[in-house]
Amino acid sequence: SAIVYFLGPVERVHAMVDTREAGTSRYSGSPAMITWKHTQGERYGSWEIVDAPDLLIRTGYYSADEWVEITGTRGILWVTRCSGDLLGEAPIILCRDGEVRRYHDMAVDWGDSFVRGAHEFTRAIQGGYQPDLDAREARHVLAFSLAAMKSGLERCEVSVEP
């Protein structure tokens, strides 16, 4: 949903995924490369998934690390923390106008995001207002995910249903 939140709806997606047994009963979608085009403007994205079982990652959860990089015409924004803290960097880094700014003063624990999301949803119901992620956007995020899975299985580009 961060992809849609930052850059808007996705038009089409292409995924290259190696599916193999991981352990006794689960399948892994790693390694993988997923690319997509947003519906508005010249906005493209990619998501690389790599299995690195021997890589030490600081985390209070599971040994995975995710981050987001958004490159625009005037700068780059990095969100360096989701479930892990591989880089030990500020959670938000902005490179713009020849300067790099690091933003540290924020709650970044992965578990806190679920608590804040649940509180936001409850307040929206009680207060009668729309939460940040509405039903239409949630359905689009699901459609994007399903299209990526279909693309990986069928080995072709897939349009994301509106």
Q: Where in the sequence are the language-model features?
A:
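Contiguous beta-strand/loop segments that form the cofactor/metal-binding neighborhood of enzyme cores
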Residues: 1-84, 111, 115-127, 161
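Short polybasic amphipathic segments
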Residues: 68, 84-99
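A short alpha-helix capping/helix-coil boundary motif
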Residues: 98-101, 126-128
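C-terminal helix-rich "cap/oligomerization" subdomain common to oxidoreductases
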Residues: 120-162
